[in-house]
């Protein structure tokens, strides 16, 4: 009996212990599941927060982009509004001041024909109003509201050389004497004017270069443009020959006006014989217009108004047909002959044109200089180019003496017309 009670008691204890252990395990499992659920919910919450942050960032970027577009559209709208306002403003009448009457009144000749006595706006400085000035007039009251700049021919502005030619004095051979004279007349007065002041003389104003075609007249002018800091204006004589009356003379006047404004400056007139030929009695309408242009050129070169630091270089291969008026001192103070080079000059020119060429050892420049008697600088350059073409034709990267012989033979065959020697200076002044 006692044993059975003992067994029953032990079983109850074990059952109770098992029940408690089961409860503990169940609580642990419940806690673990709860933690897992909480962790899962936390991860889901973080994912939602990250997604919302990404959407917020995207919306902020879109907002900034829209703000930029809005700002750009506002700017364009403002520009268009201003343009519309300008288009609504009535046009102004252009007139020319004829006379000044009092402080705030001027006589103006309008572009439509009649002249008016008009008032001057307080926004315009009366000192800027002088006879000949172009002004803007209000369409209704004809009040002077603005002063226009001087009218200039765009063709004169286009003749100004912005980029300097890549030619220096060392690139010219056989013309040492001519280079010395041109530097004395052009460079020295511009760079060292005090030397002439000390001696008490006025520097020469102009140079005329004459000689056969291809002797280097234009090349000398290019070297002057490179070596000086002066404004260089290049004009071809035929550009001054115009169709309508007074157009050529007006262009000459504008060229010299531009040169004076940009002083120190150099005006180079190439092929000057196109407008400076001798004047004759037998004239057509075109000849008369050329003579008007010539007379304007003569007046600008040595007229009533001082020319200032403006130097003139003329070039021609027909000095015998030039008008004596343009050759007198005061217009062209020095008349420099640029002849065909002698043997020494031809050798120097050949050295200049072959210094970048890949020459064979058998090339003898002295012999080539002897073979090319009567050739000018342009023909010597053509010989060097032709010799290089002969080497390329033979698939070689160097030039031999035989290439030069063939080139000389080819160029000399083309030289059929002998260049006439220029007339003597005494004949020019008669």
Swiss-Prot record:
Changing residue 430 to A/W: No effect on PAN's ability to stimulate gate opening. Still associates with the proteasome. GO terms for molecular function: ATP binding; ATP hydrolysis activity; CTPase activity; GTPase activity; proteasome-activating activity. Optimum temperature is 80 degrees Celsius for ATPase activity. It is found in: Cytoplasm. Optimum pH is 7-8 for ATPase activity. Is more active at pH 8 to 10 than at pH 5.5. ATPase activity is inhibited by EDTA, N-ethylmaleimide (NEM) and p-chloromercuriphenyl-sulfonic acid (PCMS) in vitro. Homohexamer. The hexameric complex has a two-ring architecture resembling a top hat that caps the 20S proteasome core at one or both ends. Alone, can form a complex composed of two stacked hexameric rings in vitro. Upon ATP-binding, the C-terminus of PAN interacts with the alpha-rings of the proteasome core by binding to the intersubunit pockets. This is Proteasome-activating nucleotidase. It comes from Methanocaldococcus jannaschii (strain ATCC 43067 / DSM 2661 / JAL-1 / JCM 10045 / NBRC 100440). The gene is pan.
């Amino acid at each position: 009996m006692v044993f059975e009670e003992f067994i029953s008691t032990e079983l109850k204890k074990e059952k109770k212990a098992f029940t408690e252990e089961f409860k503990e395990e169940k609580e642990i499992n419940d806690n673990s599941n709860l933690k897992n659920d909480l962790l899962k919910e936390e991860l889901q919450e973080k994912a939602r927060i990250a997604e919302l942050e990404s959407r917020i960032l995207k919306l902020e970027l879109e907002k900034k982009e829209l703000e930029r577009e809005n700002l750009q559209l506002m700017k364009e709208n403002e520009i268009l509004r201003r343009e519309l306002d300008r288009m609504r403003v009535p046009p102004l009448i252009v007139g020319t001041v004829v006379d000044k009457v009092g402080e705030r009144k001027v006589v103006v000749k309008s572009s439509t024909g009649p002249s008016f006595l008009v008032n001057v706006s307080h926004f315009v400085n009366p000192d800027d109003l002088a006879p000949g000035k172009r002004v803007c007039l209000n369409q209704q009251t004809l009040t002077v509201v603005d002063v226009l700049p001087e009218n200039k021919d765009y063709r004169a502005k286009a003749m100004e050389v912005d980029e300097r030619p890549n030619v220096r004095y060392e690139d010219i051979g056989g013309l040492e004497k001519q280079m010395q004279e041109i530097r004395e007349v052009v460079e020295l007065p511009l760079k060292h004017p005090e030397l002439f002041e000390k001696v008490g003389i006025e520097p020469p104003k102009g140079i005329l270069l004459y000689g056969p075609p291809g002797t280097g007249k234009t090349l000398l002018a290019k070297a002057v443009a490179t070596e000086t800091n002066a404004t260089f204006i290049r004009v071809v004589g035929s550009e001054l020959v115009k169709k309508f009356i007074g157009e050529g003379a007006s262009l000459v006047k504008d060229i010299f006006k531009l040169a004076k404004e940009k002083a120190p400056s150099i005006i180079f007139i190439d092929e000057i014989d196109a407008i400076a030929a001798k004047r004759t009695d037998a004239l057509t309408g075109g000849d008369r217009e050329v003579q008007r242009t010539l007379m304007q050129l003569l007046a600008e070169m040595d007229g009533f108004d001082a020319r200032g630091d403006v130097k003139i270089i003329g070039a021609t291969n027909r000095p015998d047909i030039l008008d004596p008026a343009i050759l007198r001192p005061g217009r062209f103070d020095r008349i420099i002959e640029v002849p065909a080079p002698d043997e020494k000059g031809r050798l120097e020119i050949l050295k200049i044109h072959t210094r970048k060429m890949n020459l064979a050892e058998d090339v003898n420049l002295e012999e080539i200089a002897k073979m090319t008697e009567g050739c000018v600088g342009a023909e010597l350059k053509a010989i060097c180019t032709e010799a290089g073409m002969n080497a390329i034709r033979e698939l070689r990267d160097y030039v031999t003496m035989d290439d030069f012989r063939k080139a000389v033979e080819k160029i000399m065959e083309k030289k059929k017309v002998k260049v006439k020697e220029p007339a003597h200076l005494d004949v020019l002044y008669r």
